Each structure stands twice: as structure tokens, then as C-alpha cells.
């Protein structure tokens, strides 16, 4: 919802993956508890992911320790939402 802010730390990731592996990567992403959603994209990136976590540290560990280490991921762009 517009204007409504979750109290959990959130991040949005754009993921580039090896050709033809987007379904496999999405399947693996959905196994990670912090992944709120993962959708295929058309054009500049392959997948968009929303992450929610209990803490910023847990969010960082999920991004660096789990998602970026998945097979077939070539690159990521991550933005983390901050409180005002």
C-alpha cells in the first residue's frame, strides 16, 4: 500500500542470472524465509525480489550469505529502505 511502511527492514533486489535459469533461481529464492516475493522481469534484469527481515544484520546476511551465493546468479543490484 502506498504510504504504509512495514516496521521490518526491507530490501529490493534486481538479479541478473544465466540465460534460461530464471525459473530455477526463483525456485531457490522462494526457499529463503526472508524472500517476500520473487518475480520474473522482461528487459534489463531477470528477477525482482523483495526481502523482509527482523534486523538489518539478518538482511545483510541473507543477501550476501545466501542469495548472492546461489548458482546461476551473475549480478545483483540491491536497495535497502530506511526509516525517515
What are these regions (language model features)?
Residues 1-84:
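A compositional/biophysical signature of low hydrophobicity enriched in polar/charged and small residues
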